[in-house]
Amino acid sequence: MTKFPKETNMEGLKELALSLLYLDIQKTKFSPMVVSHPFTNNGITAQIVNGEVKTLNIFENKDDLNTWRKGMEDIINKTDKPYSLYFLINKPYALVFVKFAMPYLSQKDFSSLLSDAWTRTEMPSNDSNFKPSEFIKLFKSADKRFLMETDELQQYEELPDTVTVYRGVKSDRPNKVLQLSWTLDPDKAEWFAKRFDEDGVVYEATIDKKNILALFSRRDESEIIVDLDYLRDLTEYEIPSEDMSQVQ
């Protein structure tokens, strides 16, 4: 059982953020315009310096990088709420930030931030920084009252004791079926299977409600987060022929 502080430790969060700020800027194939870093994906950015807007090339110019970091330090040190600090984080790094911020967060704040980070991230199950078991541990540590929005929690509470779930994967990646993210909607699973105009496969399985870690409907995906150890009756779902005829 994870032990959370009663109140979020903002000083601890700020120290974490400052350590992330000084990580190296990572090159991408679109650099110098696009980079990878916990606080930005822009290699060319603008910042107010001495009352004037200045263009900074933080990828190629060390002085510009130092200027940008000093400005970000000031912003970080002035934040007084966990959400204000969290929203400074570059979206691809949101889940990693929540993972390392966990020791400083109250359970309420942790649950809320985990929920937002998961639903903001494109294909979070594929994040190479996490094993499925790590995600399961994070979700099990969360309080469902703050992990889900009010309507989502109500939908979760109304689920039957045993639930049928679906997942769409590319036909050449059947191993990807063993992930946390499933859906209640077979049509949505089919969409994910076909989203890149490739042949895909939809799987169905059953799971007891007590082993469902979260339900997220905010992206219109009827997403179900499951504890993989308790999935059963995994089979390939036969897509109805009338649906297949609509796939171009």
What function would you assign to each model-found segment?
Residues M1-T164, S171-L180, P186-Q248:
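Conserved NAD+-utilizing ADP-ribose enzyme module
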